[in-house]
């Protein structure tokens, strides 16, 4: 059995850990408010951008001059999985849930005879995926040096993806990220971004519009920007999801530390009481012997 001194050291260590997890919980809660506001503010713009493009694309999708970002390459053989995760851990299942969804999609595609490539944004996803798909990771982008996520970061990713598409390196690109719903609910999401999936209801709209310039020219300008907008939205959703998951994880860790301290203190008090009782018995026995 551990000595009383060892028990005191263990209790003090657990209390120190509890202070750290509590501080991390408070920091995550503070950052979550800003991240959640940014993610929710980006949703209407991203949704409206998709709706406008879908409306225009409904008439242009079948035309010979339709942009490749809309019409695709005509093949479905090479898939690029754009996996966006966090740069840090201590966030529960946030990173692993995104990686799990991407891994399942990759294995399903490979089982169908498709070729799969990975573009990893974020250190944690890259570290997990390279254990199984090291040779299939074509690019890894580290955002640890970025203090504040901006549209320029999404544009940089979009340009890299677009350059690979124009070079004929893949046919389909799917974006993986975590959609923020609440502090305790982050939804791993897969969204096809190349070629753009046109919403059926919008594409079938009977409302007729006249466009100036022509639909194909408008789409040629809008589609690359929409790619960056959807990636930016995913980064913001991921950021909010990360802080929500971290806040929840640190809250659980703080509660668990409190329970451990309670149990350790109980064992310490019982051991101390037993030791005092033993010493008293020895003193009494010695007095009686005299």
From Swiss-Prot:
Keyword Chaperone assigned: no
Taxonomic lineage of the native organism: Bacteria, Pseudomonadati, Pseudomonadota, Alphaproteobacteria, Hyphomicrobiales
One GO location term (cellular component): plasma membrane
Gene3D superfamilies in alphabetical order: 3.40.1380.10, ATP synthase, gamma subunit, helix hairpin domain (1.10.287.80)
Domain of life: Bacteria
NCBIfam families per record: ATPsyn_F1gamma, PRK05621.1-4
Record's subcellular location: Cell inner membrane
Identification of the protein by name: ATP synthase gamma chain
Signal peptide: none
SUPFAM superfamilies: ATP synthase (F1-ATPase), gamma subunit
Principal localisation: membrane
KW Amino-acid biosynthesis (keyword) present: no
InterPro entries the record matches: ATP_synth_F1_ATPase_gsu (IPR035968), ATP_synth_F1_gsu (IPR000131), ATP_synth_F1_gsu_CS (IPR023632)
Function: Produces ATP from ADP in the presence of a proton gradient across the membrane. The gamma chain is believed to be important in regulating ATPase activity and the flow of protons through the CF(0) complex.
Record family assignment: Belongs to the ATPase gamma chain family.
MF (Gene Ontology): ATP binding; proton-transporting ATP synthase activity, rotational mechanism
UniProt keywords, alphabetically: ATP synthesis, Cell inner membrane, Cell membrane, CF(1), Hydrogen ion transport, Ion transport, Membrane, Transport
Subunit structure: F-type ATPases have 2 components, CF(1) - the catalytic core - and CF(0) - the membrane proton channel. CF(1) has five subunits: alpha(3), beta(3), gamma(1), delta(1), epsilon(1). CF(0) has three main subunits: a, b and c.
Annotated membrane topology: Peripheral membrane protein
Gene: atpG
GO biological process, one term: proton motive force-driven plasma membrane ATP synthesis
A Pfam family annotated for this UniProt entry: ATP-synt
């Amino acid at each position: 059995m551990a000595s009383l001194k060892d028990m005191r050291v263990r209790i003090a260590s657990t209390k120190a850990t509890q202070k750290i997890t509590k501080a991390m919980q408070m920091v995550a809660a503070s950052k979550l408010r800003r991240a959640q506001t940014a993610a929710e503010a980006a949703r209407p713009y991203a949704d409206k951008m998709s709706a406008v493009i879908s409306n225009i694309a409904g008439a242009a999708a079948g035309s010979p001059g339709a942009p490749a970002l809309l019409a695709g390459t005509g093949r479905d053989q090479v898939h690029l999985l754009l996996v966006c995760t966090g740069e840090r851990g201590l966030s529960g299942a946030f990173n692993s849930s995104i990686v799990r969804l991407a891994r399942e999609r990759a294995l399903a595609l490979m089982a169908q005879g498709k070729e799969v490539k990975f573009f990893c944004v974020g250190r944690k996803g890259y570290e997990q995926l390279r254990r199984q798909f090291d040779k299939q990771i074509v690019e890894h982008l580290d955002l640890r040096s970025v203090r504040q996520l901006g549209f320029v970061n999404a544009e940089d990713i979009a340009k890299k993806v677009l350059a690979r598409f124009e070079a004929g390196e893949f046919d389909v690109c799917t974006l993986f990220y975590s959609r923020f719903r609440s502090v305790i609910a982050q939804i791993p999401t897969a969204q096809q971004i190349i070629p753009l999936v046109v919403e059926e209801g919008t594409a079938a709209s009977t409302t007729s519009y006249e466009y100036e310039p022509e639909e194909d020219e408008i789409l040629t300008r809008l589609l690359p920007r929409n790619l960056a907008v959807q990636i930016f939205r995913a980064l913001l959703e991921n950021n909010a999801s990360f802080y929500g998951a971290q806040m929840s994880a640190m809250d659980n860790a703080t509660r668990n530390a409190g329970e451990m301290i309670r149990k350790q203190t109980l064992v310490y008090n019982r051991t101390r009481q037993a030791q005092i009782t033993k010493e008293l018995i020895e003193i009494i026995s010695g007095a009686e012997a005299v």
